Design a protein with these regions (language model features):
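Short beta-strand segments enriched in hydrophobic/aromatic residues
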Residues: 18, 34, 96-98, 131-133
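Surface-exposed, charged secondary-structure patches
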Residues: 39-40, 50-104
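A short, polar/proline- and glycine-enriched secondary-structure boundary/capping micro-motif
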Residues: 51-53, 102-106, 136-144
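Non-catalytic cap/lid and distal C-terminal segments of serine-dependent acyl enzymes
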Residues: 61-63, 109-112, 142-145
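Short beta-strand edge/turn micro-motifs at domain boundaries
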Residues: 91, 110-141
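Early exported N-terminus immediately downstream of N-terminal targeting peptides
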Residues: 31-49
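Residues that flank catalytic or metal-binding motifs in active/ligand-binding sites
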Residues: 36, 79, 111-113
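Short, low-complexity N-terminal intrinsically disordered segments enriched in polar/charged residues
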Residues: 1-36, 145
Length: 145
């Protein structure tokens, strides 16, 4: 398996972990996907157009999203991907749509997960950091072509 294929499997597992009908998520898979020191960062703009960021560790993210996932069907579906590898580091831009059903043709939102990876001593790729932002007026997804 190539590095790109292995990283692709990590990305697929990350989306599978957060996607599903309303109800709890299986966070036990987090340690296979994310490095123990990983950070996840949600970004956006406030009502005045000022940028904000929320930085979370693994436990912070699962706690932060618990109520949302308990009350909402949520499927994050990848619609594009670009991976670059250099030695034991890699990055990916993963374009996504957030949907209420996997086959929903009218997504609630679209955005980019910018993901950084590290290949550890065990040879496995894991996410070290992931930062994301959503489309909004004046900000459209790029063509990764």
């Amino acid at each position: 398996m190539t590095d790109e294929e292995a990283i692709g499997r990590v990305i697929d597992a990350m989306y599978a972990m957060v996607s599903g009908p309303k109800g709890p998520r299986d966070w036990s898979r987090q340690r296979d996907v994310f490095h123990q020191d990983a950070r996840q960062m949600r970004t956006g703009l406030d009502a005045n157009g000022k940028p904000w960021i929320k930085i979370m560790g693994l436990n912070d993210y699962s706690s932060d999203t618990r109520d949302f996932f308990a009350q909402n069907d949520f499927f994050e579906v990848e619609i594009g991907r670009r991976i670059r590898v250099f030695g034991n580091i890699a990055d990916a831009w993963s374009l996504y749509e957030a949907r209420t059903a996997p086959d929903d043709t009218n997504p609630e939102r679209r955005g980019i997960n910018a993901i950084q990876f590290y290949r550890g001593e065990d040879g496995r790729w894991r996410i070290m950091s992931m930062i994301w932002d959503n489309e909004r007026p004046g900000l459209k997804l790029p063509d990764l072509g």
